[in-house]
Regions:
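Surface-exposed acidic/polar loop and edge beta-strand patches at domain peripheries
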Residues: 1-170
C-alpha cells in the first residue's frame, strides 16, 4: 500500500470537508470525503486492464450538497423508500420528510449523506468516520451514534462497515 493522502475538497458551514485517498501498489484507488462519508473515487481496471474511476459523482464539492441522487454517499438511517413518508413503531406514528411524490426516499434531506463526519482514525489502507444524529432528525426516533469504516485491500477489494448505536427503538 502507498501512503494515504489528504486534501481539502470543500467547505461546509465553515468547516473543511476533507478527502482521503488510499492506493494499492497495484494501482487501485479509493477516495472518501468526510461529507456524507461519501465515496468520491474507486479506480479499478476494466477487462483490458485499463484503470478508471467507476463511481458516479461530481468534480466539485458544491454539487454534493443537496445531492438528490446521493451519488457515492452513505445512506441512512433508512436506505430505500418509505411509502407515504410515515411509519409506526411501538404504537407511535412517525411522520417523515416527503421528498419523492408522497414518499420519503433514502431518509430525506437530513440523512447521513448530509452530515459532516469526523475522522476517528486513518491508516494507509482505510479510515473510520463518525457523526451523531439527535432524536427527531428527519422525523426518525432515537439519538444515533454512527461509525462508518472504509478499508481497501491490496487486491483492490474494498469493504464498508457500519456501526450504529441508539438510545431507543428506531
Amino acid at each position: 500500500m502507498k501512503a494515504y493522502t489528504e486534501r481539502v475538497f470543500g467547505n461546509h458551514e465553515g468547516k473543511d470537508v476533507l478527502a482521503y485517498r488510499f492506493e494499492t501498489d497495484g494501482g487501485y484507488q479509493l477516495e472518501v470525503m468526510t461529507y456524507g462519508a461519501t465515496i468520491l473515487r474507486y479506480v479499478t481496471p476494466d477487462k483490458a486492464g485499463n484503470f478508471a474511476n467507476v463511481i458516479l459523482g461530481f468534480d466539485d464539492f458544491e454539487s454534493y450538497v443537496g445531492n438528490s441522487p446521493k451519488h457515492g454517499a452513505s445512506v441512512g438511517p433508512v436506505a430505500g423508500r418509505i411509502a407515504g413518508a410515515t411509519f409506526e413503531l411501538n404504537g407511535k406514528t412517525y411522520d417523515l420528510e416527503v421528498n419523492n411524490a408522497s414518499n420519503c426516499n433514502h431518509s430525506g434531506s437530513t440523512g447521513w449523506d448530509a452530515s459532516l463526519f469526523e475522522l476517528v482514525e486513518v491508516s494507509d489502507n482505510g479510515l473510520t468516520l463518525y457523526t451523531e444524529r439527535t432524536d427527531g432528525t428527519g422525523g426518525f426516533p432515537g439519538n444515533l451514534k454512527i461509525w462508518i469504516s472504509y478499508h481497501l485491500e491490496e487486491t483492490g477489494a474494498y469493504e464498508v462497515s457500519y456501526k450504529v448505536t441508539t438510545d431507543q427503538d428506531t
